Amino acid sequence: MSAIDPIIICAATRRQQPRYMAKKELFSVPVLAPCIKALGAYPVDRSGADAGVVLKTVHMLENGYSVGMFPQGTRRPGVDPATTPVRSGVGFICSHAHAQVLPVYLKVRGNKMGFLRPVRVIIGKPIPYEEYTGGGEREGDAAYISKYIFSRICELGSESAGKAK
């Protein structure tokens, strides 16, 4: 995950631009704040559980908005995404909103974004609520749901690596 991932995904999904959570500190940077607001970002306090933002995100999904979320919750340049820990927020939000999930994988050489480095955007098939909750049996298991969704995202990267050989 890199700082420009939301911009790349917005460009790839032009028909329905997703909104994004961004750490609240970014909204105090004079040049950056207007740009991220224009991309539909809204602030989140990462120092603890920001219940207001979670509820806002659930409501946005319930009302048909697209929301881009990153299961890892932070950037780890140069690290294979499949080896990174996953946070439970994505699972909690998606299961409470009964949202369909569109997995997106950004493939870049060495897992590091760079100026003029080519990026391949791989968009998978939507994951319905019934699938990631096991027919509703795992509805409250946010950690499981986040890991399941993230595994489906990582599969996109693995499948594309297999095709390149």
Predicted features and spans:
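Catalytic core of membrane glycerolipid acyltransferases/transacylases, capturing the structured
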Residues: 1-48, 56
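Non-catalytic C-terminal accessory region of glycerolipid acyltransferases
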Residues: 53-165
